[in-house]
């Protein structure tokens, strides 16, 4: 019977050492000179590596969980040879950090993770962007509006109006909410100066306006007018003002997020607001203050004329009474200015009061005035401003204008069938709705089960996701309108207030809560992701937006991957 070999206590020797020791032992006459059968060795013990958690790189000794892979977007050695045609959102980087390796040589190297184990990598990323809030890439610098482009007379003297949908483009930049609204209004006015004015369109026909006021403040339900004669110059919420035939279209624009106007079903196609949609949002007309004050002044003058006629008949008596009062006026001495202890009146004032009382007693009794019917004050709507621009009243006897406000229709219109039923008033987002970004490491991470391997950037498997690091920052400025007025004279921003005499076309007031767009670096921990067992020396890193496009506004992209064993592959 074949006897088993005896070994010292400890870990079993390797298979190669046992096989090579058998002939030597037989030659020396060892008791174990019988030929040995190959022992059974489990598959997980077949390799002379440093362990199941070993990481082998090139000809170096195996390492144990000490390797970190750094993904850097602007390594100087990678720029000329790997990234000359790439940007910070789609780049190649060498993960072999030896200085004596060129990018070409590093691309031939690999980092091998022990294939008897399942490996994962803890992925942490740092992302920094420098994206303005108004730009073409994010569809935030354009919007469409339906405006009047022509006014003419037909052969039978009928007014013919022509409307067209026009696309307006804003200059790119990082603007506050107030400045963006001013630029939108300025784009409409510039189109009027270029097209509408040349075709007979009046200034009062500018039918699209973005504002921030509540035009119903000061509304009197009895007269149906805004009784102060002016609209309250206070910002409440961004608003859209339309004339008949006009409208705005945000189907391919994200500027509606800046205005705080959204759809209740945001995933439905199209976003167009027309004049007919704003039913119940007509802006009330202003009181004609000049006519009202003139009517009151006429009543006063008529009353004064009647009294004057009575006094003229007794002009001699009036002169005599005045002369008597002058004669009775005492000569003031030095003690007349002393203040007594029981009253604040001086002696001179007391004497003067006594003289006036004596003069009234000496004057003849005044004739009783004949009461006349008092004239009612004139209360009528203001039809035009001081520059003869019409306020577009619905009719001569109406107290409402043809202008319709989205804000008024939303708050005062029918909530069941009006604009409130399918639009939503929300907080203005000066970032115009920041989207998400996706991280892809196609050469390092195993493809998730929901993706398949591909070479197209727009279809790279996604291994991480985060919000675009662009935030809306708000602060309170109680003197916003005052600052706006000062800047109008110092920075010459009166170009945004081309019609200051018109209460509707005037520049909208700045809100007290000012919001700006800010790029804030983001540090994100994406958790543990499954790694490939063989990692190439050159890795591709791709950051795509919600439409799976590389983002040119990525300013810095860093990634750190820490490999570790997740579980055994052979158990």
Swiss-Prot record:
**Modified-residue entries (Phosphoserine), positions:** 455
Per the entry, induction is: Expressed in the late phase of the viral replicative cycle.
Q: Which InterPro entries match?
A: Adeno_Penton_B (IPR002605)
Domain of life, per the record?
Viruses
In residue numbers, the region (Disordered) covers: 298-324, 347-383
Check the record and name the Pfam families matching this protein. Adeno_Penton_B (PF01686)
Q: Where is the signal peptide?
A: none
Biased composition annotated in UniProt, kind: Low complexity: 314-324, 356-368
Keywords, A to Z, come to: Capsid protein, Clathrin-mediated endocytosis of virus by host, Host nucleus, Host-virus interaction, Late protein, Phosphoprotein, T=25 icosahedral capsid protein, Viral attachment to host cell, Viral penetration into host cytoplasm, Virion, Virus endocytosis by host, Virus entry into host cell
The biased composition feature labelled Gly residues covers 303-313
Short sequence motif Cell attachment site: positions: 340-342
State any GO CC term.
Answer: T=25 icosahedral viral capsid
Q: Name one GO molecular function term.
A: structural molecule activity
What is the similarity comment for this entry?
Belongs to the adenoviridae penton family.
The record describes the protein's role as: Major capsid protein that self-associates to form penton base pentamers, each in the shape of a pentagon, situated at the 12 vertices of the pseudo T=25 capsid. Involved in virus secondary attachment to host cell after initial attachment by the fiber protein. Binds host integrin heterodimer ITGAV-ITGB5 (alphaV-beta5) thereby triggering clathrin-mediated endocytosis of virions. Mediates initial virus attachment to CXADR-negative cells. Binding to integrins ITGAV-ITGB5 also seems to induce macropinocytosis uptake of the virus.
Additional comment: All late proteins expressed from the major late promoter are produced by alternative splicing and alternative polyadenylation of the same gene giving rise to non-overlapping ORFs. A leader sequence is present in the N-terminus of all these mRNAs and is recognized by the viral shutoff protein to provide expression although conventional translation via ribosome scanning from the cap has been shut off in the host cell.
Q: What's noted about domains in the record?
A: The cell attachment RGD motif is exposed at the virion surface and is involved in binding to the integrin heterodimer ITGAV-ITGB5.
Q: How does it assemble?
A: Interacts with the fiber protein (via N-terminal tail region). Interacts with the capsid vertex protein; this interaction binds the penton base to neighboring peripentonal hexons. Interacts (via the cell attachment site RGD) with host heterodimer ITGAV-ITGB5; this interaction promotes virus internalization. Interacts with host WWP1 and WWP2.
Q: What is this protein called?
A: Penton protein
High-level lineage = Viruses, Varidnaviria, Bamfordvirae, Preplasmiviricota, Tectiliviricetes
């Amino acid at each position: 019977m074949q006897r088993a070999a005896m070994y010292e206590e400890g870990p079993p020797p390797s298979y190669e050492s046992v096989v090579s020791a058998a002939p030597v032992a037989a030659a020396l006459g060892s008791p174990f000179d019988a030929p040995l059968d190959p022992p059974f060795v489990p598959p997980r013990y077949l390799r002379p590596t440093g362990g199941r958690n070993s990481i082998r790189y090139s000809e170096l000794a195996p390492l144990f969980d000490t390797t970190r892979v750094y993904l850097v977007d602007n390594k100087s050695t990678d720029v000329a040879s790997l990234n000359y045609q790439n940007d910070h959102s789609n780049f190649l980087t060498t993960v072999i950090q030896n200085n004596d390796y060129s990018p070409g040589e590093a691309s031939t190297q690999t980092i091998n993770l022990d294939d008897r184990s399942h490996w994962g990598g803890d992925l942490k990323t740092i992302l920094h962007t420098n994206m303005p809030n108004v730009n073409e890439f994010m569809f935030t610098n354009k919007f469409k509006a339906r405006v009047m482009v022509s006014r003419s007379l037909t052969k039978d003297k009928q007014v013919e109006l022509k409307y067209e949908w026009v696309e307006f483009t804003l200059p790119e930049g990082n603007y506050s909410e107030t400045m963006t609204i001013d630029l939108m209004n300025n784009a409409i006015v510039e189109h009027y100066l270029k097209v509408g004015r040349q075709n007979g369109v009046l200034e009062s026909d500018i039918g699209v306006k973005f504002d921030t006021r509540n035009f119903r403040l000061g509304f009197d339900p009895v007269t149906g007018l805004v009784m102060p004669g002016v609209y309250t110059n206070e910002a409440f919420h961004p608003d859209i003002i339309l004339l008949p035939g006009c409208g705005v279209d945000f189907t391919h624009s994200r500027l509606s997020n800046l205005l705080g106007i959204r759809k209740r079903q945001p995933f439905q196609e199209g976003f167009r607001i027309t004049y007919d949609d704003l039913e119940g949002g007509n802006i009330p007309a202003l009181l004609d203050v000049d006519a009202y004050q003139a009517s009151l002044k006429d009543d006063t003058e008529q009353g004064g004329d009647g009294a004057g006629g009575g006094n003229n008949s007794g002009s001699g008596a009036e002169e005599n009474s005045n002369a008597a009062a002058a004669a009775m006026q005492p000569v003031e001495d030095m003690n007349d200015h002393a203040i007594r202890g029981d009253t604040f009146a001086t002696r001179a004032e007391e004497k003067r009061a006594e003289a006036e009382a004596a003069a009234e007693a000496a004057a003849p009794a005044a004739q009783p005035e004949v009461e006349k019917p008092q004239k009612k004050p004139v209360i009528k709507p203001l039809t035009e401003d001081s520059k003869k621009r019409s306020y577009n009243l619905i009719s001569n006897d109406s107290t409402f204008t043809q202008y319709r406000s989205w804000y008024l229709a939303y708050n005062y219109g029918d909530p069941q069938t009006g604009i409130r039923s399918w639009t939503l008033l929300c907080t203005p987002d000066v970032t115009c709705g920041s989207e998400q970004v996706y991280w892809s490491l196609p050469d390092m991470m195993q493809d998730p089960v929901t993706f398949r391997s591909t070479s197209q950037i727009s279809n790279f498997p996604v291994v991480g996701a985060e919000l675009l690091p662009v935030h809306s920052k708000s602060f309170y400025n109680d003197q916003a309108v005052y600052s706006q007025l000062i800047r109008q004279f110092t920075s010459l921003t009166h170009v945004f207030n081309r019609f200051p005499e018109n209460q509707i076309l005037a520049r909208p007031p700045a809100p007290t809560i000012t919001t700006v767009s800010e790029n804030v670096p983001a540090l994100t921990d994406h958790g543990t992701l499954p790694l490939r067992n063989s990692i190439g020396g050159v890795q591709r890193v791709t950051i795509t937006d919600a439409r799976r496009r590389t983002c040119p506004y990525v300013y810095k992209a860093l990634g750190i991957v820490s490999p570790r064993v997740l579980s055994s592959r052979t158990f």
